[in-house]
Amino acid sequence: MLRSLWSGVNGMQAHQIALDIESNNIANVNTTGFKYSRASFVDMLSQVKLIATAPYKNGLAGQNDFSVGLGVGVDATTKIFSQGNIQNTDVKTDLAIQGDGFFIISPDRGITRNFTRDGEFLFDSQGSLVTTGGLVVQGWVRNGSDTGNKGSDTDALKVDNTGPLENIRIDPGMVMPARASNRISMRANLNAGRHADQTAAIFALDSSAKTPSDGINPVYDSGTNLAQVAEDMGSLCNEDGDALLLNENQGIWVSYKSAKMVKDILPSAENSTLELNGVKISFTNDSAVSRTSSLVAAKNAINAVKSQTGIEAYLDGKQLRLENTNELDGDEKLKNIVVTQAGTGAFANFLDGDKDVTAFKYSYTHSISPNADIGQFRTTEDLRALIQHDANIVKDPSLADNYQDSAASIGVSVNQYGMFEINNKDNKNVIKENLNIFVSGYSSDSVTNNVLFKNAMKGLNTASLIEGGASASSSKFTHATHATSIDVIDSLGTKHAMRIEFYRSGGAEWNFRVIVPEPGELVGGSAARPNVFEGGRLHFNNDGSLAGMNPPLLQFDPKNGADAPQRINLAFGSSGSFDGLTSVDKISETYAIEQNGYQAGDLMDVRFDSDGVLLGAFSNGRTLALAQVALANFANDAGLQALGGNVFSQTGNSGQALIGAANTGRRGSISGSKLESSNVDLSRSLTNLIVVQRGFQANSKAVTTSDQILNTLLNLKQ
């Protein structure tokens, strides 16, 4: 009877423990990071009356044991580490673990390690990351001397998590020092099409072949010793942005006065022949019959073939005056006045070899060494020099070929608006002739007329260019351009607005220059303008990809006490690829330009990423990884010892803590501005309360029943 009594008592005690455990679960239904427990019931030692026996061969069968249980007990309280719900908070230092793992905290700043799932952290007055109970969170902290200004941007977002754990402490007054720019990367297209959407006037050139007085909008004079910037005429555009696209041998004729020839005509001649500019002219005239003089007949015969010779005849008293004003496009046959075969009859006074040459052919060539003797040009300076030379020969024959530009009376320049300009200088007491300029296009059986080039140069046409009077100018010539700007940072954190200008210099060639504000200087800049670097070169492949560039870097001296020279790599793309600069038939446009420098900045705010990295946001717009929270996981989470305050300690049955970063090993991820709720399920807990209550009540019945039986036994004595 005593067995049943004590079994009931044990049952009541066990269910009391279960009630305590479940009540504790319910009490912590709103405790952050709490993990509920359950009572593990086991039966107690049984009293064996008879042991079990095995069957005997040809005898009795086997028998089970005869034993009586002695009640129930609680063997353990099992902690259930299932995932709790994640709830959002407005606190940036709140952390929640999604998956396996525990935060590592210490009550003595790193000597002792405890563990928790409760990520309700905050910074104390010294910048330490602590729990609400004052335990310091453990992890890895960025080296104080490493402020991220020397490595890559990727390195700045990482913390070395291979070292020993530290107390996470962040200086509230942290300052990120400035980082000097050492790289500019750019993605852009430079228009390779027939029409340029962005243009600028070509560089100015002076009549003395000297150099620019300033390096940004060059106006050339004789006061400096810089190299003159001449441009490939074939790569230029007219003022509307239409590309000239000059082909080999395309060009123009320019005359500086009309070709003229005056000859006597024999009036009595009837059969007359003459060869002008390679065209044979003949007529038969009997003035008695036609009542037309040989003078008029000769004029009519010459004018009848004007479209083949370019020559028009006029009556000048009893003489014939021939004139070629260079109005017709064409080849040599339409220019000047050249008697190629002696005349007969009325033309008897025209001798073979008579000529008046005033029109000069200027033809474009791709060669870098054009032959000036035959009027070849490639650059703006080549053409300027040819026009100036020939204009002075026509106007001042005495100067011949040995004149000096600075002494010539005809000055040709390219002005600041990109126009070829001819000026008939006033030479004081020396009487000079006026100029009559005519421009026409060159064409032949093998060369077509470049109308855009001819029309642009026809602006030079003038009835009379008077000595000391107004100059004559062509239309504006432009080159395709594109410009962009970016702020670069020196070692002191000072911004410098750097402007990069591109201009087309050939079919697949572009030049670029770089300008920084004064007093800054660029290595390679001129003595006159040290803040301007000229001479950058870009070459593109026939598919528009970048073939190469030079130079690959700039050297910059801010002239303000910062480190100098500051080397800045120009990352404009890889050779043969489209990852940087391209040149295709598309508008010039910068898609992206960036540099890797930044100014000094104060720590303004923090947040955590999914790896538990504490990211600091600074006033300079930069983000730096300041620390990383460590996580620990165990072979047996249920073996941890609860210490209260949502804190656990390691035990022999939990196994050693395996420490590492979030998202590595079996460790879960970390969510910032979130907390993990208690995993207590009220519906389950309340149901368990009912079950425990019924169990307790049933065990109490066993006690009362045993008591009644004992009373019955006592009554037998009476």
UniProtKB/Swiss-Prot annotation:
Keywords: Bacterial flagellum. GO terms for biological process: bacterial-type flagellum organization; bacterial-type flagellum-dependent swarming motility. Its main location: other. It holds the Pfam family LlgE_F_G_D1. One of its GO terms (cellular component) is bacterial-type flagellum. Transmembrane segments: none annotated. It comes from the Bacteria. It is found in: Bacterial flagellum basal body. InterPro entries: Falgellar_hook_FlgE_sf, Flag_bb_rod_N, Flagellar_FlgE/F/G, Flagellin_hook_IN_motif, Flg_bb/hook_C_dom, FlgE/F/G-like, FlgE_D2, FlgE_epsilon. PANTHER family: FLAGELLAR BASAL-BODY ROD PROTEIN FLGG (PTHR30435:SF19), FLAGELLAR PROTEIN (PTHR30435). A flexible structure which links the flagellar filament to the drive apparatus in the basal body. Absence of the gene leads to absence of the hook protein, lack of the flagellar filament and thus loss of mobility. Approximately wild-type levels of the flagellar subunits are still produced and accumulate mostly in the cytosol. The N-terminal amino acid sequence was from strain CCUG 951; the DNA sequence was from strain CCUG 17874. Disruption and subcellular localization experiments were performed for both strains. The apparent pI for the hook protein was 5.1. Belongs to the flagella basal body rod proteins family. This is Flagellar hook protein FlgE. It comes from Helicobacter pylori (strain ATCC 700392 / 26695). The gene is flgE.
